[in-house]
Amino acid sequence: MRLHTMMTRFALLALLAIPLVANASPSHMKIAADNEPGQRIMINGRVFGSDGKPHGVVEIYAYHTDAQGLYRRDRSKGSARLGGTLVTASDGSYSIDTIKPAPYPNRDIPAHIHIRLRGPGINQQDEIRFEGNGPTICHLIQNRCNVDFRLR
């Protein structure tokens, strides 16, 4: 009986030590909850090194405005409410499930998602834009787009 009690306590402690995360994979993040107002989008892509080869295990921090163009900061975290962090897979791939951000109200700046790439020797800021031309433009096709990043 005593061994059974010890094993039960061990199993319970082991279960409590498992982090409870909403993301199925560290290379995927869900920024906006299902009930967040706005157009749902999925962004997939890869991170490449300056040599053009896939670069894995890069931290991506992303944040953006809501469907009204406002950040509405989460005071408890001191950061944008719609934001999060992921780590790219070994092949550099990542995916972000969120809503399409709106442009800032009364400003002539296209809707965009702020991106920070970090890792050993890496500290790069970028953005995903929803208008214009360039390598990090999100051209939505059926609410999906592909955006790759090249490290500088």
What do these predicted ranges mean?
Residues 2-11:
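Bacterial N-terminal signal peptides that target proteins for export
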Residues 10-19:
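Bacterial N-terminal signal peptides
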Residues 18-26:
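Bacterial Sec-dependent signal peptides at the C-terminal "C-region" and cleavage site
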Residues 25-152:
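Beta-strand-dominated extracellular/periplasmic modules and repeats
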